[in-house]
Regions:
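Positively charged n-region of N-terminal signal peptides that target proteins for export
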Residues: 1-4
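Bacterial N-terminal signal peptides
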Residues: 8-22
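Short, low-complexity N-terminal intrinsically disordered segments enriched in polar/charged residues
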Residues: 26-71
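Short beta-strand edge/turn micro-motifs at domain boundaries
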Residues: 26-28, 32, 122, 142-169
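Short beta-strand segments enriched in hydrophobic/aromatic residues
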Residues: 57, 69, 127-129, 162-165
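A solvent-exposed, acidic/Ser-Thr-rich amphipathic alpha-helical stretch
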Residues: 62-127
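Short, surface-exposed coil-to-beta transition loops
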Residues: 107-109, 140-145
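Beta-strand elements of well-folded, non-transmembrane domains
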Residues: 127-133, 151
């Protein structure tokens, strides 16, 4: 019984020591590289950009969609790059074809992996695109985004989004 208790105490002690060492070493490595840690508020603000992008697209709300992006943002997907606010706005006009309101799709995101960088933050995030006009709703596309984020006077914004679609090839 004493051996079990001693083993338990050693394990708890090591866990406590490692919890103190790891964050400090992470901070010092980041500080040496000029990278600031992200706060919980930063994480939430970055995740909100996904909601702005998704709901702006799903409800054909151009201004909401554009509010996720920096003025000089680039979106890379099949077919090439869309550059800047004017390019993003023109792409939305082309896609919406003058229609407004619910498009009958829902973008769903998950597995957010957000990390600080010297210039802001980056993330890889999975997405599913669902058709909700049929019953049951079904997945019509899936993939992931690789994003670079910058902090602006208006808060966090997407600087560069690369969209990768899952394929069966």
């Amino acid at each position: 019984m004493k051996k079990i208790f001693l083993g338990l105490m050693i394990s708890i002690g090591l866990a406590l020591v490692s919890s103190l060492i790891v964050p400090n070493s992470y901070q010092s490595v980041n500080a040496e590289q000029g990278v600031q840690e992200l706060s919980a508020k930063d994480f939430e603000q970055i995740k909100e950009l996904y909601a702005r992008y998704n709901q702006g697209s799903d409800f054909r709300d151009t201004e909401l969609f554009l509010s996720a992006f920096a003025d000089d943002a680039v979106m890379t997907r099949e077919g090439g790059d869309i550059v800047g606010m004017d390019g993003l706005r023109a792409d939305r006009a082309r896609r919406y074809e003058g229609k407004t309101g619910d498009v009958g799709r829902r973008h769903i995101n998950g597995s957010y992996l957000i990390t600080p960088t010297p210039d802001g933050a980056e993330a890889r995030t999975y997405y599913l695109l669902m058709d909700v006009t049929v019953r049951p709703p079904n997945v019509i596309s899936s993939g992931y985004y690789e994003d670079k984020f910058v902090r602006t006077d208006a808060g966090w914004k997407i600087k560069h989004r690369t969209l990768y679609r899952d394929t069966l090839d």
